[in-house]
Amino acid sequence: WFGNNNPNWLWHYHVPLRYLARNPQLAVGATRRNTFSSNRCFPISAKMERPNNPQSYGRVTSANSATPYRGGLFGESFARSVFISEPVHNLVHREVLKPEGVSFKSHRAKGEEKNEFLASTDNWFRPVQIKTGPDGALYIADMYRLIIEHPEWIPAAMQSRVDLRAGHDKGRIWRIVPKGAKLRKIPRLDKLPTQQLVWALDHPNGW
């Protein structure tokens, strides 16, 4: 499976922990690997005033929700894409997987070498989760907050000038589709006989 953390776009866990748990005496090395080659990102939003680590602008600092695309709606060129939300920089990043042994390496998509799959000029755009929908579209949960950092990282003097809770009662969900795409009808799986449910396992949409 795939995962990440704040400064790392994408990890691949190539040894499921359930297998290692069978032998608690076994000394095991790394069970995951970094697949990406660069932690650069390309935001288009205005750089906001922050006292901590100004050099981190343009570097991934809040990667989350590593989501392999399994919808089929975006076409064959997206077949091995993994989407990653980056709320601090107001963007969604894409890595393309390339098999390497029992794991993968990944790289930026062609045409996205110096830009992102999705980036916003809105500093309130805070994508925090991505899912593939039954219609093949990408659905993005947008936290919609002015301040995304933990308050402990913001000096008291600055805290007094901003509303740390601004947007706490708001949020947005975005549906992302290719231009001109025709969305699939969503079948009622609960109405299908068993045979058709089995056939549905071969559908390009993994949902």
Model region roles, listed by residue range:
Residues 1-198, 202, 207:
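Beta-propeller domains with acidic blade repeats across secreted/periplasmic ectodomains
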